[in-house]
From Swiss-Prot:
Catalytic activity field: a quinone + NADH + 5 H(+)(in) = a quinol + NAD(+) + 4 H(+)(out)
Recorded topology in the membrane: Multi-pass membrane protein
Record's keyword terms, sorted: Cell membrane, Membrane, NAD, Quinone, Translocase, Transmembrane, Transmembrane helix, Transport
Compartments, record wording: Cell membrane
First-level EC class: translocase
Annotated transmembrane regions: 10-30, 66-86, 91-111
Organism: Bacillus mycoides (strain KBAB4) (Bacillus weihenstephanensis)
PANTHER family in the record: NADH-UBIQUINONE OXIDOREDUCTASE CHAIN 3 (PTHR11058:SF9)
Family: Belongs to the complex I subunit 3 family.
UniProt-recorded name of the protein: NADH-quinone oxidoreductase subunit A
Annotated GO CC locations: NADH dehydrogenase complex; plasma membrane
Designated gene of the protein: nuoA
């Protein structure tokens, strides 16, 4: 008989397998069952019903990369701050100091990026 510890891992393993298997099966069945009728109209770029007048493949400037990277960093910060805020009363002063250090480190990085004029658009 499996212990509670092993049973917990079994449940996680089942969810992991289902999470991988169900999308793969659904996509495979969709690919096998759909009609395959390629045409030039289906291959064109969709522009709200208007006939496309140039190629849709454009190059983005490298500045977009920096903004995307900063967004991801502060988005991950939110992911770390939310559980801390929910359990704040149970964590105590040490967790508050740890979170303040974490936020200050991110703010120092933001100030550095601002000082280096990384955030200026033009």
């Amino acid at each position: 008989m499996a212990s509670v510890y092993e049973n917990s891992y079994m449940i996680v393993l089942i969810f992991l397998l289902l999470g991988i298997l169900l999308p793969v099966v659904a996509l495979t069945l969709g690919k096998m069952l759909r009609p395959n009728k390629p045409s030039a109209a289906k291959a064109t770029t969709y522009e709200s019903g208007i006939e496309p007048f140039h190629d849709a493949n454009i190059r983005f400037h490298a500045r977009y990369y920096i903004f995307a990277l900063l967004f991801v960093i502060f988005d991950v910060e939110t992911l770390f701050l939310y559980p801390w805020a929910v359990a704040y009363d149970k964590l105590g002063l040490f967790a508050l100091i740890e979170m303040l250090i974490f936020v200050v480190m991110l703010l120092v990085g933001l100030a550095y990026a601002w000082k280096k004029k990384v955030l200026q658009w033009l």
